[in-house]
């Protein structure tokens, strides 16, 4: 199972055979820093075009300000503007969905998880992007993966999932 946390940034975790995969020295699954567009927006990591700059609270707010010259106070305000049908907010959300779908495609084709579970504060707005995201992922992945790969919202439970995985691992 892959867990992607959609919040201020975009984080990730991978639980494989009951163990949390955290890479060499605990730095695995920095999924938000996988490049989506090489010449894209500057990321907080210093690189350009990271997926996080397209789908995260900070990414949405920064890109909204770049496009409109107006700053928003929160991701909730960004999603409220989407609910009201604001064109710029809608375009940015759709670009974010594409970036996130491409990231998921890469993860599915690389590690073949049974599930990708989305957690974090942005999942509270799943009704605005969840179906589009699932449909786009289905379009992008190999047909065999479509038959069993589940794309699910998990709510704002990323910390709980991470702690549980660490506890399971430490018991062994």
Listing of model-derived features with the role each one plays in the protein:
Residues 35-172:
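ATP-binding/phosphotransfer module of carbohydrate and carboxylate kinases, centering on a glycine-rich
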Residues 1-54:
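Glycine-rich phosphate-binding loop of actin/hexokinase-like ATP-binding domains
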């Amino acid at each position: 199972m892959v867990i992607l946390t959609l919040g201020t940034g975009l984080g990730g975790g991978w639980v494989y055979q009951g163990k949390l995969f955290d890479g060499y020295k605990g730095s695995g699954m920095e999924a938000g820093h996988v490049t989506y567009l090489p010449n894209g927006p500057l990321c907080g990591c210093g690189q350009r075009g990271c997926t996080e700059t397209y789908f995260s609270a900070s990414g949405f707010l920064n890109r909204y300000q770049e496009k409109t010259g107006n700053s928003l106070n929160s991701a909730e305000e960004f999603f409220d503007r989407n609910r009201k049908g604001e064109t710029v907010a809608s375009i940015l959300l759709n670009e974010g969905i594409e970036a996130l779908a491409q990231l998921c495609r890469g993860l599915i084709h690389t590690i073949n998880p049974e599930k990708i579970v989305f957690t974090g504060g942005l999942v509270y707005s799943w009704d605005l992007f969840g179906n589009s995201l699932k449909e786009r992922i289905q379009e992008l992945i190999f047909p065999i993966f479509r038959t069993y790969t589940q794309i699910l919202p998990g709510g704002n439970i990323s910390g709980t999932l991470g702690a549980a995985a660490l506890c399971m691992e430490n018991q062994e």
